[in-house]
């Protein structure tokens, strides 16, 4: 019933609770969260990275100028379609979008802080 999710190794798609999708550099990061099982402290999740497809788009036909742009991987769109059938996400309001952007910003801050700390430790070793 969900061939693309099964191809990812998800044997029980009905246990999917929600998912998130974000873009980092030239990759889309899909994270799938499963329903928390009895006795588990945290709900299980899996993460997948998909490279964005690079396309050259004609900007000006007179000068034959092209612009490089990226778009979501076709396989990822098929997976998202299946995930939407399972999770039936609600439409996002402008407030939801603002919260998502702030959440992504906080996540980026943590990633950068962690990387800075890692580099500083490497410097101390020298």
Swiss-Prot record:
InterPro entries: UPF0325. Pfam families: DUF3461. It comes from the Bacteria. Belongs to the UPF0325 family. This is UPF0325 protein VF_1965. It comes from Aliivibrio fischeri (strain ATCC 700601 / ES114).
